[in-house]
Amino acid sequence: MAKRDYYEVLGVAKNASDDEIKKAYRKLAMKYHPDRNPDNKDAEEHFKEAKEAYEMLSDGQKRAAYDQYGHAGVDPNMAGAGGQGFGGFADAFGDIFGDIFGQAAGGAARGGRGGPQVYRGADLRYSMEITLEQAAHGYDTQIRVPSWVSCEVCHGSGAKPGTKPETCPTCHGQGTVRMSQGFFSIQQTCPKCHGTGTYIPEPCAHCHGSGKVKETKTLEVKIPAGIDDGMRIRSAGNGEPGINGGPPGDLYVEIHIKPHAVFERDGDDLHCQMPIPFTTAALGGEIEVPTLAGRASFPVPEGTQSGKTFRLRGKGIKGLRSSIAGDLYVHVQVETPVKLTDQQRDLLKQFEKSLAEGGARHSPQSKSWFDRMKSFFE
């Protein structure tokens, strides 16, 4: 049966404080303690599960390893040989590929043959919402992201001031141990020091032995002009710090563009709906439309129908990989007047009568519709 997440067992968040973890454990321990639940196997299992979770999460080093690698980081059996997990396979062949490429299987580089494993830090993702105008023109901004930094109290050693990490007695500072499985000799991460080659008898109270603390970091981010929704900006080296001297990961800023009140974006092109008076549609005229660069005007020919699309070249967005801007497509919607006065009604009736008497032509759409209706009734 797969182990449950330790945070889930205690019912706390992953960023829970030591006090919150201790309080949650005490509550569960009192509830499921064997003395309170004699001959209750289910309560006994819950008690053992809570005890194990507390032992791992109350220890700074073990908690850091668990946060990074899950159960495999704190349970040596999960990375063993004999097909019990992918970690065992990686460790079995790590020395061979490490000697050739300088990197062990599974992405863990080694400081040297038999030395502690070196891991690249995890990448981080930051979701950022910007306006269409900001995406079109680009701009510089700052973001604040939580980040792990070296502990100022122990200077990153993880040890209580006045003490220092000691050589791991299990692996003798190698970071790995060898296990014999029949004809095979398999090398795996040391279960006591988790590959560091050292252990900390007296952990730093400030960082709980991890050698790092979380703080908010302010970063400068340059949003390039023409960026589109869903694109990511890479900030090299601003991810999680590496382990055992490994390189840090990267930060990826994922861009999301807010819906615009006027425009819809389609690649480098923009679309907008433009209402126009029915008199302008019938008589023609000049209309003014908004663009991201200001206002622009263009002529509307007489007899313009609702739904007609006009293309304004170069009034869209200049994309990241384009030297010219896209176009703006204006979709006109002819407005029908409402709440007419008596005088306006009379004028429209006279106008309607003049159309019939004067033989004014219908629009192409209505003419086609009338022709189809005529053939339908014949």
From Swiss-Prot:
Zinc finger (CR-type): 138-216
Domain commentary: The J domain is necessary and sufficient to stimulate DnaK ATPase activity. Zinc center 1 plays an important role in the autonomous, DnaK-independent chaperone activity of DnaJ. Zinc center 2 is essential for interaction with DnaK and for DnaJ activity.
Top-level taxon: Bacteria
Function of the protein: Participates actively in the response to hyperosmotic and heat shock by preventing the aggregation of stress-denatured proteins and by disaggregating proteins, also in an autonomous, DnaK-independent fashion. Unfolded proteins bind initially to DnaJ; upon interaction with the DnaJ-bound protein, DnaK hydrolyzes its bound ATP, resulting in the formation of a stable complex. GrpE releases ADP from DnaK; ATP binding to DnaK triggers the release of the substrate protein, thus completing the reaction cycle.
Listed PANTHER family: CHAPERONE PROTEIN DNAJ, DNAJ HOMOLOG 1, MITOCHONDRIAL-RELATED
Keyword tags: Chaperone, Cytoplasm, DNA replication, Metal-binding, Repeat, Stress response, Zinc, Zinc-finger
Lineage, opening ranks: Bacteria, Pseudomonadati, Pseudomonadota, Betaproteobacteria, Burkholderiales
Subunit field text: Homodimer.
Gene Ontology CC annotation, any one: cytoplasm
Occurrences of domain J (ranges): 5-70
Cofactor comment: Binds 2 Zn(2+) ions per monomer.
Gene coding for it: dnaJ
Protein known as: Chaperone protein DnaJ
Recorded GO MF terms: ATP binding; heat shock protein binding; unfolded protein binding; zinc ion binding
Organism for this UniProt entry: Burkholderia vietnamiensis (strain G4 / LMG 22486) (Burkholderia cepacia (strain R1808))
Family the entry assigns: Belongs to the DnaJ family.
Ligand binding (Zn(2+) 1): C151, C154, C204, C207
KW Amino-acid biosynthesis (keyword) present: no
Listed Pfam families: DnaJ, DnaJ_C, DnaJ_CXXCXGXG
Predominant location: cytoplasm
Cofactor(s) annotated in UniProt: Zn(2+)
Compartments, as annotated in UniProt: Cytoplasm
InterPro entries in alphabetical order: DnaJ, DnaJ_C, DnaJ_domain, DnaJ_domain_CS, HSP40/DnaJ_pept-bd, HSP_DnaJ_Cys-rich_dom, HSP_DnaJ_Cys-rich_dom_sf, J_dom_sf
UniProt key word Manganese: no
A GO BP annotation: response to heat
Residues that coordinate or bind Zn(2+) 2: C168, C171, C190, C193
Entry coiled-coil feature ranges: none
